[in-house]
Curated annotation (Swiss-Prot):
Organism ancestry: Bacteria, Bacillati, Bacillota, Bacilli, Bacillales
Gene symbol of the encoding locus: splB
Catalytic residues as annotated in Swiss-Prot or TrEMBL: H75 (charge relay system), D113 (charge relay system), S193 (charge relay system)
Signal sequence extent: 1-36
Top-level lineage group: Bacteria
Broadest EC class assigned to this enzyme: hydrolase
Protein name listed in UniProt: Serine protease SplB
Length: 240
């Protein structure tokens, strides 16, 4: 995809956080969009990997990248401050991996929509494996790369409050990878911002941040592709 196409595509999309209220409610189990091959599945058990790597904000999603450290979008973290709370892999009213306080927020200095958030190690509300954040979550590892045609999955909390913090997994093909941009055909909604974009081995290729406004067979979703520079920034800001 050339830069002009990327710019035009980005101009036509909207950032989907639950603050906007844009989007439609997910079906209970599986939804398919014929040509785009978009599949959305409700996650039944969030206490197994890769779901133990995902966390919920009040209005969006994040995921674990290291000790006491999660990743989300800048447009998500700007609505939070030190002392606010995140919940590790909640599963509606069936429990979660604990509730934790934010202790530090570090935004990526470039244009990419990436923000590192460090949390207090000890839970405000314990998870199934005690009060330690790192005992209740599983950090993701990076993929070697990604290319057009490969299948990816986006795991997150669309309309988290409306859907009672039920986790959903959406799959589809990669359309293009260029620089720090990855475009894919996977159904995402308000609240999916900050979701991990994973390959078939559940390895990180990027972070979701937006989707086209249109809701048809040609609707694409957009993520930040993890370049060496972005990986370096994340590594330097993992809690010690």
């Amino acid at each position: 995809m050339n830069k002009n196409v990327v710019i035009k595509s980005l101009a036509a999309l909207t950032i989907l956080t639950s603050v906007t209220g844009i989007g439609i409610t997910l079906v209970e189990e599986v939804q398919q969009t014929a040509k785009a091959e978009n599949n959305v599945t409700k996650v039944k058990d969030t206490n197994i990997f890769p779901y133990t790597g995902v966390v919920a904000f009040k209005s969006a999603t994040g995921f674990v990248v290291g000790k006491n450290t999660i990743l989300t979008n800048k447009h998500v973290s700007k609505n939070y401050k030190v002392g606010d709370r995140i919940t590790a892999h909640p599963n509606s009213d069936k429990g979660n991996g604990g509730i934790y306080s934010i202790k530090k927020i570090i935004n990526y200095p470039g244009k990419e929509d990436v923000s590192v958030i460090q949390v207090e190690e000890r839970a405000i509300e314990r998870g199934p494996k005690g009060f330690n954040f790192n005992d209740n979550v599983t950090p993701f590892k990076y993929a070697a790369g990604a290319k057009a045609g490969e299948r990816i999955k986006v795991i997150g909390y669309p309309h988290p409050y409306k859907n009672k913090y039920v986790l959903y997994e959406s799959t589809g093909p990669v359309m293009s990878v260029e620089g720090s941009s990855i475009v894919y055909s996977a159904h995402t909604e308000s609240g999916n911002s900050g979701s991990p974009v994973l390959n078939s081995n559940n390895e990180l290729v990027g972070i979701h941040f937006a989707s086209d406004v249109k809701n048809d067979d040609n609707r694409n979703a957009y993520g930040v592709y993890f370049t060496p520079e972005i990986k370096k920034f994340i590594a330097e800001n993992i809690d010690k």
